[in-house]
Amino acid sequence: MLPESTILKHIAKQPKRAAGFKQLVRELGLRGDERRELDSLLQKMVARGTLLSVGSDRYALPAAAADKNLIAGRLTMHRDGFGFVIPDSKSLTPALKAKLTGDIFIAPHLIGNAMHGDLVLVDISNVRPDGRAEGRIVRPVMRAHPTVVGIFHYGSRGGYVRPIDSKITQEILIPAGMEFPSVSPVSSVVNEVEGAEPQRTRRTQRKGSVDRVLGDEVARPAEWDDLEGLVVDVEITDWPSPTQNPRGRVTEILGREDDFGVDVEITIRKFHLPHHFPAAALEEAQETSAVIPSAELERRRDFRGLPIVTIDGETARDFDDAVYVRMLENGNFELQVHIADVAQYVTPGSALDQEARLRGTSVYFPDRAVPMLPLELSTDICSLRPQVERLVLSCVMEMDHRGELVSYELSEGVIRSVERMTYTGVNAVLEGDAAARSRYAPLVATFELMRDLALILNRKRERRGSIDFDLPEPVIEFDELGLMKSISRSERNIAHRLIEEFMLSANECVAHDLESRHVGSLYRIHEKPDAKRVYDFEVIAATFGYSLGVGALPIHRVQTKTDRRAAYGTGKRVREIEVPKEVHITPRMYQKLTEKIAGKPEERILSYLMLRSLKQARYSEENLGHFALAATSYTHFTSPIRRYPDLIVHRVLKDVLRQGSSQHVSQSLHPRIEEKASPWSKRRVLPDSARAGAPAPHTALGGPIGVEELHEIAEESSRAERRAADAERELMEGKKVKFMQDRVGEDFDGLITSVTKFGFFVELTDLFVEGLVPLNTLTDDRYTYHENTREIIGQRSRKIYSLGQKIRVLVDRIDPVEKKIQFAVLEEEPVRAKGKRKKH
């Protein structure tokens, strides 16, 4: 495979640091498949921002474009027609990076033919003192939406589709004859959405007919003679211009927007979630044998005689992990974590592997899932079903009574799970339920040992400063028609805790082992928060009388051109924005604050705000530690059925095990994990001779996967994870809005979760539904927004609406198109939240 570094070095040598496709083919001496490989690789590098597409089949280094004041970034549109471009840091010169710290405003007439989400090339015209800028779009580099889902309408000049995503601001014209799809894609029930019957034949679709998944059933093809008001998916055939709307053709008819199941179909297409398995991948899955050869069993470590169990939710169908705990003769605990050996069946470069990499992760909706692997594997051959022999990768850890790791073994193994347990069932046993303890009598002692060890491991994490936000999550119940029946608070019991602690331990153990061997792998990293976010949180926390304890933050003040222009000639002082510099912050600071606010009225809001101040965790080929877990090394090893990075870690580990003289790694190869100091502590890290040091970026490492490919997989997987999370969140919000439509006029207790210049957001206490109280609806006084304290204050009455305040609101109106809820305030005299400005 052609290395990316070769391409980058070759382009860097060119006079303008740019080269054409044919030039690269000629000068690199590529032929046949190598040409196709180069084309595919160039497209991937453009998608990641490593290269810029600067003309017809011509590519340049981002720095070359930056020299001409051109940078690449992702366009976010506003429904009023203007947009913002978030710059790609790779395309910024050091000088521009120092000045440009915000996004780039694009006026409507400077959007050109770009659409929301496109990767675009921007010409910067002005950088403001606050780090934001203005510019114009030169051209799109890569399109984000080859297809668009929307509502079909008939107009005076023919059909058009109004996109459901309001950020796609232009309607898509549908020429005559392009309204009905002639051929259906492989049905979305092709072993792709859990709960549906497999159907694998490609069929010619009758005019206006459609197949879609309805929960556990497959809809019959429906006849549509009139498309008015129906949801359709459209392929863009002609991109927009400054004077012309985009054009397209209908590829799928999904049904009416309010039909059961259509909201999921809309979400799948809006977020471009891969949901059709290629025929080659399905064929590989069907040909995979569940029979384990005797030679394979003999070479693996045999755990079949132990009472190993899986513990999952009631509706789970893919069982990644199984666990077992026992006491050793020396009084220590032995924790066994067995993970489905997916890498045994999904081999590198296979059709299954390519599709799994494309998907990156399984996506879970309330009534179904879009799995990463076909159901033959995800719910059968790879799933650790009870009383069935299954291949696993095993992490067996010996731990003392402080939870410290004494020794461990990693091996390829085989298990036979004795019971498929649920969190509810295990919790009942541990809570002393007589019926549950009788039913699972042979396992009661094991579950009690698991509980004891989990509590020890939790205390160990607390000692090192690990942050634990125990935030409630909503649980949605549906009726037989698939409509929301209720929303309730999720219950997190001891069974959830023990599985969480065991998986964390296994992930950390594997990460440290691979790092100590200097083997290239993927890590799950969580970097320390930005100074600006810490500063913003400290300002808000101070109004409640709390602090993270970071001390006085060094800041510098800037003025924006807009503020200077507004103040000119008025005699008013120009407003200054405070921008913090670097700040020393540790996980323990967050942990101590969570302990202080535990059980207090302000706990919920401050916990949310602390969480928002942190960065998102992501995947990386470079180990940068995990801030929230206060872990020096961490990876994802425990869910290879539903996460592609875990599958990669399995491949790396299996290669390590098979290279060794035996099938397990002994502790002698790795010093005590705790010897390595936290990267956020003030203590010095031990020298390399005494610890497993993190390799420098792009160091030559061993292992089956090169650093460049690992980097590529890490970025792809991080994007896929964010895409899945966004899709799951949006669908959930849509269902909440639909649930509240019949409750307009009803009043509820709520909590103010965010205060802005245009109003404040309230989350209903019992329903986890959020809505906005617009500032202009507070008509009893003239209210102003105070940015420093995040408060809205009445100028005459001095009424205050502030973060964390309990409030009674009425459901005023619902916007089903934008999926937004508007509340109206009921209480006459808002009261500050308890604990406000309390000194600690």
Residues covered by each model-derived region:
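Charge-lined substrate channels and their catalytic hotspots, especially those that engage the 3′ end
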Residues: 1-336, 343-388, 425-428, 738, ...
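Short, acidic/hydrophobic/Gly-rich beta-strand patch recurrent on exposed beta strands
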Residues: 84-88, 105, 160-165, 761-766, ...
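Electropositive polyanion-binding surfaces
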Residues: 200, 228, 233, 238-240, ...
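Acidic, glycine/serine/threonine-rich low-complexity segments
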Residues: 208, 695-696
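Short Cys/His-rich micro-motifs in 6-15 aa windows
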Residues: 829-831
